[in-house]
Amino acid sequence: MMRNILNEVTLELEEKQITAHNMLPEGLTVQGNSSLLYSIFRNLTDNAIAYAGTHISITIRCFREDERFYYFSFSDTGVGVGPEHLSRLFERFYRVDKGRSRKLGGTGLGLAIVKNAVILHGGTIFAKIPPVEVWNSYLH
């Protein structure tokens, strides 16, 4: 699925000179609603393309699995968000930069859709800013 999403956004990635690293294991199969799973990864990808900037990289990896869950990390090396926004990123209609979002046509729903789709699969999602300039969202 992730390979298909990256193929769908190839033009946007090239225009913004974004490098995408799909580090998911070949043949990884996740049980769940395929439309919602697609929505999760597509919205995270679209969000990174729209707001992270140019000349960045996006990395998607499965960093752990157990008998119930896969644990994914979706990160980019873009402009990031301030720590004051982290607790609200997944709220409906929340925008970090209202002017920029309006100009780019964002609705403020993408990450809320992601959160709800993750919850419907019994998981959680959160974002954090590590010591280096990378924005991470984790979901399981």
Name each model-derived stretch.
Residues L11, V79-G80:
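Glycine-rich G1-box
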Residues E14, T19-L28, E65:
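Conserved catalytic submotifs in the C-terminal HATPase_c
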Residues A48-I49:
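Short helix-loop "hinge" at the ATP-lid/N-box region of the Bergerat-fold HATPase_c
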Residues T54, G122-G123, E133:
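Conserved glycine-rich
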Residues H55-R68:
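Short beta-strand/loop element within the Bergerat-fold HATPase_c
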Residues D76:
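Acidic ATP/Mg2+-coordinating residue in the GHKL
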Residues V81-F93:
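Short conserved segment of the HATPase_c
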